[in-house]
A protein has these predicted regions:
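Short secondary-structure junctions
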Residues: 4-8, 145-148, 194-197
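P-loop NTPase catalytic core of nucleic-acid-dependent motor ATPases
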Residues: 54-168
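Short glycine/serine/proline-enriched coil/turn segments at secondary-structure junctions
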Residues: 115-116, 177-179
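Residue-level signal for pocket-adjacent positions within structured domains
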Residues: 158, 169, 192-196
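N-terminal nucleic-acid engagement/recognition segments and initiation subdomains in replication
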Residues: 1-83, 95-99
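Walker B catalytic acidic pair
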Residues: 172-174, 185
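Conserved catalytic/switch belt of AAA+ P-loop NTPases
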Residues: 183-197
């Protein structure tokens, strides 16, 4: 029931445990319920040992939700990448848009399976307000919790924490106000292979 989520770097409860929960992340309330249950059922009261045991169990049940999702996919033979940008955003269905999206998607998949692998490409979509660019990226992320558009500044102390747990990151606000200096900061940011949290 408890597993270590590699993507978010936290312990999750992945099976029902007898009380209502809002999210999968193991939180303080969950710990209180678990401590009460273990005390009443088994007479266990040493919180440090219980916490250590939960850590061991979680570590033995590691999972990565994006990898798990991608590994379940089976291609049905329908070509989608070539016409995806045209279908969703009205872009030209030419070789450039096809190759750009294909490269972006291959990079996203590679990063899911090999965090920190070299991938310095950012897909930039240009279009008016309400064209669907943010929605497109959110849909590419598959689940809302794997998408973020909250990256406003790269010099923010919390920038890496904001990346944690997300697969697709939109930088629309940052790009809208970009200048030569900020473009160089973005390039430098994209070229980092190891993020420190």
């Amino acid at each position: 029931a408890i597993a270590y989520n590699i993507l978010t770097d936290r312990k999750d409860i992945i099976k029902p445990i007898g009380f209502h929960r809002e999210s999968t992340a193991l939180n303080d309330t969950d710990m209180k319920y678990l401590l009460l249950y273990l005390e009443e059922t088994y007479g266990l009261t040493n919180e440090k040992k219980i916490d250590n045991a939960i850590g061991i169990v979680a570590n033995e049940n590691k999972y990565h939700p994006i990898r798990d999702y991608l590994n379940t996919l089976v291609w049905d033979g329908t070509e989608r990448i070539r016409f995806c940008l045209r279908h969703f955003l009205g872009a030209d269905a030419d070789d450039y848009t096809y190759e750009a999206l294909k490269l972006f998607l291959l990079g996203a998949i590679s990063r899911a399976f090999q965090p920190g692998c070299k991938f310095e490409i950012m897909l930039c979509l240009v279009g008016g307000q309400g064209a669907g660019k943010s929605t497109f990226f959110r849909l590419l992320a598959v689940r809302d919790e794997w998408f973020s558009d909250d990256l406003r500044k790269l010099d923010d102390d919390n920038v890496y924490r904001k990346l944690q747990g997300h697969w697709i990151i939109e930088m629309s606000e940052m790009m809208a106000t970009a200048n030569a200096k900020s473009i160089e900061e973005i390039k430098s940011f994209l070229s980092r292979q190891k993020e420190v949290y």
